[in-house]
Amino acid sequence: MAVIHFNEQGFDKALANGGLMMVDFWASWCGPCKMLAPTIDQLAQQYEGKALIGKVNVDEEQALAIRYGVMSIPTVIYFKDGQEIDRKVGVMPAAAFASVLDANL
């Protein structure tokens, strides 16, 4: 499954549906965000049917970035059953992101 690009309405709907979600808050001008993009795509395929992997463009969806206190990008926030359970800031190997997903499946 491809990465889901969320707007605020789609994000809120996905969050309300519960389950495990990993969301990358990013911007098109952000170099580290561009470096992280292939990792996010890989995780979306790897966890298809197990977790929802999405992205939020902070320039287009500023209200979401403010709501979750995103001050640096890339910021990856994990949600389970509608609640934030973890977050990671910066570029990391896929295994670092996967470990949080695996621990919460």
Spans of model-derived segments:
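Conserved Rossmann-like nucleotide-binding pocket used by diverse enzymes
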Residues: 2, 26, 52-54
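Short pre-active-site segment immediately N-terminal to redox-active cysteine/selenocysteine motifs
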Residues: 19, 26-29, 72
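A short beta-strand-turn-helix
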Residues: 3-21
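Structural micro-motif
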Residues: 62, 68-77, 92-95
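Conserved helix-turn-beta segment immediately C-terminal to the redox Cys motif
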Residues: 18-20, 37-56
